[in-house]
């Protein structure tokens, strides 16, 4: 039979000849069609899972998938009948020669193995041909073996195709890593043993490339001793070993696959391994080589500091570990490679690393025997299966492969070609670390990672959901099956810890159900088929939705079914299940769906980690995030947020009961170690919980348990932690916290009552800080700090960023942040400008945040000691999704967004951080970092940051960051407004409903004596006694009648305030004005609508509340003044009248009435109000606190602002006329018209020079400074002495036109003034000069001293200076 494969993007044209063979019912000697004792190692199973062969040669053609003839990867389930295709005939009838070839493969190779042959049977020759997928070469395989001619011809064709596709297609880094793994695994020769378990050698000439030939091309091979250099650590002795996942000791790294890495294991008392680049490895020759290596590294150091660091001796914490590694390396150097590998290769038990028992014993580390490790690991696996007693069809595919590898490894123990660095994986308890081990100094995570099959199947579905889009984008031409295989290849490269990140709520429940299944019966096996067929057992699942869960569990069971029929289609069902999750509501539980692999979210249900973190002292701890390692030294940092993310997710699941109306179960935390677990509850008043170990107890005490404080009756204050003075307990029953009254008064959330006080742990600080007047009610789940009286509502909206969640209802708040010495990003920093005026100078800096102010801008004096801004005193904290400015290092203040720790990439989550720190995302640069409250401040609308925004380098990045920050700020603002609107539309803000005014503080309510109440003249026989249409004297004077005084008695209709006769109204949500009040029936003009009631406060309290409202940006408040000593505040307490809005054209008015001697305010209709109309009144009546608040009443005469008088009809008409009036045309002045011409000579002496001009309009006088008696120019507007009286300086009325002499009315009498012919007057001085022949001299009218007219008390100004000609 001959058929050809046409050329396609996935294959190279080949002609394959196959001989028709007789089918037999037995396969490899099994009577029932099943393989028995067929031992196939892991390399073979991996290879077979990636080879594509026809299930039946009788079909005549090969399978086609998506139009392609060959596929690069297929699961092992599709090839389970491979033996029926190849090994036909009787058992051991054929001499099959398996040769797996790969070009450019450098790795470990083992001698090939063959099965027995039988004379007379046709010979089957298998050759795997190199195929191409998207222009990328895969491995080779085909059924042939005629010599080197076919090989060289195929190599030539492959080289041509490879060169062609390399020019046309771009290489994929992620795909290349999978490609290399496939090449390496294909190069490893697998061993298939006969039913009799006989090992038959293979002729070496059957394979042109053996593993030994490939090893000669590599610089290092398995078992070689090397020095490795990892940043931050000295040169360390290592041994090259094979990676337990890739089953290879080398791989190519980098964008162009130009850098080679080797897998090494570090010598020492802690088993740790890593991938190291070849340039960081040097062959090990002895300890004396260390100094030389340090000197060579120092010569290549880029900076002097780095050089000093490299030459520095090994620190004390690493010295013991390093010296032990040197001893082990020198011992290994004296051994042969096989002995070295046998003794020093790590044991991979389960998913953990362990030292060889012999090495651990020499190092003084106590470990369990290997047999006990295997026994103890059986409980953590799915079930302990005996290969000899359980049929192979009852073993799942994954576990069957593990069993085959175990048996294969045992049989290959004496084979020198067998790789001993990859023993069978067994779950084992971690051995005790050595004292000097850096990994031993790490805090363990408290629970081992799960490896249950139910979890693995569910995790794979989540993995497919998240990363399907990525793979499809990289391989658009691939079919669905190919995408499934690529995803499976990526999944197989992850270790158990990385796989655990893809847990879901469903996988948790399935895992628990699997554990129950494993405990049923004798523990030997589980009947998945029976459980899948019996849906009655699903009733035990308590979580909702049941229907979707049952469907998912059914699909997961189908994936794990062992029968041949379901194994063939399991991978397709997994694809369908994963894709269906995208279109169902289950995507809500998979919050990380459709996110790239780099930024995937962390697992929401992994085991919670312990608080605290210690820096690793091993070289492998400095590996990059892309390196794959199973060593304990590569575990993520055990930061407070690790447990925070998990606890919050678990809390959100458990809180569903409370959403259905049931109270959530309280989770207690130990008061000593602040951790959860099995706790002992105190039955005393403190309601505390403790671990037995924390109390020093070995077992639970009998009877009633009380802690030491409750037993002694001396409790410590929860704030100051001291018990010297008297403490009082919170009145809430289950609280149990004690406080000094002085300490608890410092917190504004403390509520004092008649029986005591309610502590701040029962109110949300975020809700109070955002709206102190109307905070959100304390109902709902609260998360309380275990160290101080701070509490928040559960959820990201209220919980402050930086809080460490230690239980579903317990946190450690950000107030307990401790700055570490030597860390620059922990230092506090303040801005260099005022937050009010944006100017520098002498600033008052906040001690908790970067805020700074001028004391004058805050209207306060410069305080002594520490000072905190208003926001910090009020308890305002940053929340997730807040846009902020961050100061990091030497960079400018940079815009960023506060991120939740579970929404950042895994490498950012692993960064070491303290309680109170939170991750931020920098706009523009797309970077992340951990920071805290003292280095950030909120972003405000309109912020522009630094003015230095260039078009190159960091300036351009900063400009883009500002644009991104502004867009994100507006987006988050709209989201929050929509959420607040949705919440506010449900019901009005909370307040306390009262019926009459409640006095506050010193305010009193007056009550008059009955004899003082006026009596009206109404009679009970009148039609409407004391009604609105009657002539009741009390009604006219706005007095309410008293029932014991009014003649009408019970028929009196002037008792609306006392009887509260209000028309029926309802509260509604208005457009743009918040909540309002509408009438439900028609209201007549003058009818009483409602009484305005609230808290009665005095003026001092009123001003204090207004000041507090201004400081905290509270705008929704209204104070109504009754008289000088009493003001009504209806904010915290009131009735329906508090919802009435303002209007410049209202339908109600406020009137002061006297009721039983006390003044009260009533609302009366000023016009007929139909039903459904909103009730409004004018707030301008004796109101305080409204400063230019925009009015939104929409009336025609709206003034625009609250507090301003509404526009009258006259003003409206004048405005209309003004708008219609045309602008008057103005006559243009001629050039020079209206300008005055100043004199060029001094008005006193008549000479020219530098003159001072008078600033008075139309005055042209000019003077010398010496003539005015001045030494410098006058400042400001200056008028010459001619305009002021020479005696008193008042404005002059009589002027001399020849000199500056002038006088006012009072002093002009007695002065001789004469007039010239042109009407100008002159003084007597000029008359004497004119008439020199006169015999009689006129006496001077004023002393000589008064003639000095330049020295005036008024401020003068220089206006203009001219030069005389």
UniProtKB/Swiss-Prot annotation:
Binding site for S-adenosyl-L-methionine: 1075, 1115-1118, 1141-1142, 1186, 1192
Top EC class for this record: transferase
Gene: Nsd2
Native source species: Mus musculus (Mouse)
Keyword Cell cycle applies: no
Protein name (record): Histone-lysine N-methyltransferase NSD2
Cell compartment(s), UniProt: Nucleus; Chromosome
UniProt biased composition (Polar residues): 603-623
Classification of source organism: Eukaryota, Metazoa, Chordata, Craniata, Vertebrata
Comp. bias (Basic residues): 1219-1230, 1348-1359
PWWP domain span: 222-286, 880-942
AWS domain boundaries: 1011-1061
